[in-house]
């Protein structure tokens, strides 16, 4: 009922709501300070990681738990597709159509790529992933979408030769170390950097790399929405 919604948000009539909705913020696109921007996509990350978290019984968030206290968290996000690459392209191109980069348009400059805004603002644009660079031909096609540099398993492994490799790539911690070095370079040059990262460690099969120790899972402490088979019982 519209009138109930108006009352709930403190309006006495529809005209009051329209006035607030019509307010425009006047901002400049020319920032005096251009910050470095890092956009990290975690493979297979879902709400169950947050819903299963228990600081004592099942610490699924690790150090992210304290970071979330000051973070803006959206818990209702939905993946654009049930697949890594379609979801990645959805973020890059804002479209459910996939795979664009492996179609006849794969080696064409796409004006609707979200990365172009950073490149036009003179950012150094980098795609960084723990998976092999030839995966889905990203080392070739992503340069057409605004990424100046693409780094993956080979580049990270060359820099950190002791890093353990998995069926899907190299451990996430090495990818983040690589990103830290890129950010330090940006500080030294004064040119801001945009880094889009795609992790691999959370991709099945779930094997923690580099001998890292993780806490055991107390199944009895998992939320009722997750049963022993790892599926949902419908009572979300």
Segment roles from a protein language model:
Residues 1-236:
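Soluble catalytic regions of membrane-associated enzymes that act on cell-envelope
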